[in-house]
Amino acid sequence: MLSKNFLTKTVPAAFFALSLLLVTACGQQSANTQPQSAAPQGEASAPAGGEDQAGKTYKIGVVQIVEHPALDAAREGFIAQMAKNGFEKDKNVVYDLQSAQGEMSNALSIAQKFQGDGDDLILAIATPTAQAALQTTKEIPILFTAVTDPVAANLVASMEKPGGNVTGTTDMNPVEEQLKLIQELKSDAKSVGVIYNSGEVNSKVQVDMAKEAAGKLGMTIQEAAITSATEVKQAAESMVGKVDAFYVPTDNMVVSAISAVLTVAEAQKIPVIAGEENSVKSGAIATYGIDYGKLGEQTADMALKILKGEAKPADMPVEKQAEMKLVVNKLAAEKMGVTLPQAMLDRAAEVIDK
């Protein structure tokens, strides 16, 4: 039989030892059940970018001011080029594709949605959507494309040094070379009609450029300002008998309703020269300009650098497309009563005849 002193001294000690063993065992079990993906304390996380950040899904908000072939081509070129470089749609990139339907208020609401969703990057196609995105966020990187003059639009401080969270690619078209096409088609042309959206900076810049270029070529520009696509046909009709040709710049509102201009031009046998090739494919006679699909690809190359952490918008110069090409539409020329010069056909990069 144990003495009272032995029990008094020994039992508490044994209980303490047993408790210590239980606490240690529980601690080891807890450590062994930590998620395997947890990084050791103090270890830097992997840099952003496709294969370097395993398991990350990027969110890219894409907004264009309106849907028409040129802007659509820029969007599809961007997505295709991203996929070629490992950023595949619905695999490691989720695109939120939006159209503002020509309304600035819609563009602002969409940009606010992108900010609320915490998107990794915003692609703004055309000037108004880029302005809306910049107005909404100064933190999310914004890339624009199909913007004629980003400095005049107050998107960047300069073409060489944007200085903020915005950069991208410009679609500045060679206006003087395009107006020369009118003289090549109709040597006695003196007056050129230009319809444009008075609310888009992009368009005002091109009208001023057209006036300057026309002056050099011995022609004048007749302007017709509109505020909605429904006014395009009436504007074109108001110029009948006053102009020798129409010039359709890369004005998003007018391009989206170019069929209205073409209807008047074909009925009155007035040649139409466009600011970009998709308008020629839609029925204008010719253009000398850029490829919007390739412009989208070029913009994607910039996005890749941003997402991989290799560059920041503030330090990335605005890029332009180096190569221009002549595209002509033989069927459109026939409908407008114009004979295409053989010299123009011979140097064309693309001839549309069906």
Label each region the model flagged:
Residues 60, 78, 167-215, 318-332:
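An alpha-beta-alpha
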Residues 47, 55-85, 96-105, 199-203, ...:
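Extracytoplasmic "Venus flytrap"
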Residues 27-30:
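Bacterial signal peptide processing site
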Residues 150-189, 291-311:
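Hydrophobic alpha-helical segments within soluble ligand-binding/sensing domains
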Residues 94-116, 224-239:
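Structural motif
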Residues 100-157, 248-266, 270, 275:
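Beta-alpha junction/loop-to-helix N-cap segments that form part of ligand/metal-binding clefts
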Residues 21-25:
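C-terminal motif of bacterial Sec signal peptides marking the signal peptidase cleavage site
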Residues 308-354:
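Hinge/cleft segment of the Venus flytrap/periplasmic-binding protein
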